[in-house]
UniProtKB/Swiss-Prot annotation:
ATP binds at residues 350, 354, 383-390, 401. The gene is kdpB. This is Potassium-transporting ATPase ATP-binding subunit. It comes from the Bacteria. The system is composed of three essential subunits: KdpA, KdpB and KdpC. It comes from Photorhabdus laumondii subsp. laumondii (strain DSM 15139 / CIP 105565 / TT01) (Photorhabdus luminescens subsp. laumondii). The keyword Magnesium applies.
Amino acid sequence: MTNKQQTLFEPVLIRNALMDSVKKCHPAAQWRNPVMFVVYLGSGLTTILWIAMLAGQFKGNALFTGNIALWLWFTVLFANFAEALAEGRSKAQAASLKGVRKTSWATKLHSANRNGSREKAPSDSLRKGDIVIIEAGETIPCDGEVIEGGASVDESAITGESAPVIRESGGDFSSVTGGTHVLSDWLVVECSVNPGETFLDRMISMVEGAKRRKTPNEIALTILLTALTIIFLLVCVTLLPFSIFSVEINHSGQPITVTVLIALLVCLIPTTIGGLLSAIGVAGMSRMLSANVIATSGRAVEAAGDVDVLLLDKTGTITLGNRQASQFLPVPGITEQRLADAAQLSSLADETPEGRSIVILAKQRFNLRERDLRSLNATFVPFSAMTRMSGVNVENRMIRKGAVDAIRRHIEANHGKFPEAVEILVQTVARKGGTPLVVAENQQVLGVVALKDIVKGGIKERFSEMRRMGIKTVMITGDNRLTAAAIAAEAGVDDFLAEATPEAKLALIRQYQSEGRLVAMTGDGTNDAPALAQADVAVAMNSGTQAAKEAGNMVDLDSNPTKLIEVVHIGKQMLMTRGSLTTFSIANDIAKYFAIIPAAFAVTYPQLNILNIMHLHSPTSAVLSTVIFNALIIVFLIPLALKGVSYRPMNASALLRRNLWIYGLGGLIAPFIGIKLIDLLLTLLILK
C-alpha cells in the first residue's frame, strides 16, 4: 500500500464501476436500499407498459413512456454507479494490500535463545507463540512482539512511508507486522497471531468487506427516508382512483396515467440522498484509509464525527516525545556523581529512550561506563504502569527511579523518610515544564533526574480549532500535577489528568460517558487496552502492542498520536456530507413539486396550469424534464459525496446556518434552473 492518493475518476475505476452498476441491478442488491428499490420497481413497471404500448396491448404515448422508463433506469444505474465507484476505490486499496501478502520462509527457533536450534518453516504455518529470528534482508513472516534485538525495518508496504523505522525489544516500538522487511541487524520475534488473523489479513477484510454494516445514524436516516417513501407511495396509489372519480363527476379532463403517477412518485421520494447514502458511508472509510488509518467499521468513522472529548497522551502527541535526561540534581549531602552512578545502574537494562539518555548523560558528565548487570549479579526491576517506577537490585543496593509519588510510597514502605528538599527540586523541574524522575537507594532519596520535553509547534492552534468545534481536549500524562499544569498551559489544552494510571484513564472515560459525551483516545501499550476498549473512538498505534490494536476500533499505520485530530475531522466531514446532501435532497424535492404536480394533474384539472410558474412547454415535457433532472442531479453530486463537503471548524449554530444557506437554498434554486434548461432542450429536440 502506498500513500498515493487516488484521483476521483481514474479510467480503470470508472470502467469497473460502470460494470458493477449493471450487476447491482439484481433485485437482491436493490432490496437493501428501500428508496431505490421503489425506483427500481417503477422502472420495471414503466418498461412493461412501454412494451405493451408498442405491441398495441395498452393505450398511451409510447414515446413519452419509453423516455420515462429510460431515465428511471438511469436513476437506478447512477445510484449504483455512485456506490460502485466508492467501493471500487476501496477495492483498489485492498488489491495493493494483497500484493504485500505472500508466503515466505521463516527461521523458526525452538527456544527464545537466539543461538539455539532452528529450522526453516513456511510463514503460513507459524502459529501464535512460535518464535522466529529475522536477519537483515529478510521479510518478517508474522505479526508479533520483538523479544530480543533491534533493527531498522522498512514498513512502506503497509504504511506507505519510505523512511525506515526502528523496532526493538522493550518500550512502545516492539510490535512488528508481517510482510515488512528488516533492513539491518536482527530481531527475535514471538508470533502473536495464527494464520489468517494477521493485521494484513484483517486490513484486507475490513477494506474490501462486501457486507458493510450500516452505522446507527445511517440506519436512522434510512428509516426516515423509507417512511417518507411509504407515505408518498400511499398518496400516489390513491391518486389514480381519485383522478378517475374527478373526471366522471366533472365530465371533463382525463384521468392521470400510470406512467405519470410513477414519475410523480419517483420525483416526490428522496431519491437523491437515497441514491448517495451508501456511497457517502463507503467513501468515509476510504478517506480514513487514505489518511493511513484503518477503521474496523463505518460505526467508528461516524462516532469520530460525534466526538466531543479528546483524551491525548502528552508524550508524542502534545510534546515531541523524545524526553532526554538533561541534569542530575542531588539532594543536600549527596554528590552529583553518586546520583549519576545510581541513576545509570538503574537504567542499564532500561530499553526506554529516557533510560538510555540517563546512561548517556552519566557517561558524558562523569565518564561512567556501562556495566554488565550479569557480572554484577544484578536483578533488573522493569517499569510497571501500576508501580510507576523501575530499578535494579545489585549486591546490597536496592536502587529505584520513578515518579515522585511512587518513590515516596516506596521509601515510606521501607520505613525511610522522604526529604522536603526533594519536593523543592521536583517543583523547580516541573515549573520549567520538565519531568522530574526521583532516584532512591534503599531507604534514602539521592536526588532528581530532570527530563526535558518540547511542545510540538502549531499544536496550540490545532487545539483552538477543536475548541471552536465544541470539542474538549484533555491531556493525559504520568507526570506530576505541576509538570502537567505547565505543559497543559503551554499547549493550550482544556484540562489534564496528571499521574495517570490505567485505572484513572478508564475512570475518566466512564465519567465523561456518564455525562452523555463521546470520548476518543489513542494508545499503544497493553496498559492502554482497557481504556481503548471503553472509549467510543479508540485509535491504536500500528507500532503498539497486539493487545492495544485488538482493543481499538481504528489502527493508525503511521503510529502518529496526533492523527486523532485528523480522524475526528474526517468523521465530522462524513456526517457533514450526509447532512448537507440530505438537506439538498429535501430542498430539491420541494422545488420539484412546483414542476411536476401542476403538470401531472393538468390533464384532470386544466385550471392547475396557472401553477406552471416556470412556464414549461407542456405537461409531458414538464414531467420528463423533472425525471431527467432527478437522475442527473445524482451524477453531479457523486464527486461531492465521495470527496466530502468542505469543513471548517466552527460552532454548531454557525455551521447549521452556513449549510442551510448553501445546501438548503441551493437545493431550492437548482431544480428551477435545471428543469427549465432541460425543458428548453427537449422542446428544441423532440417535443412539439
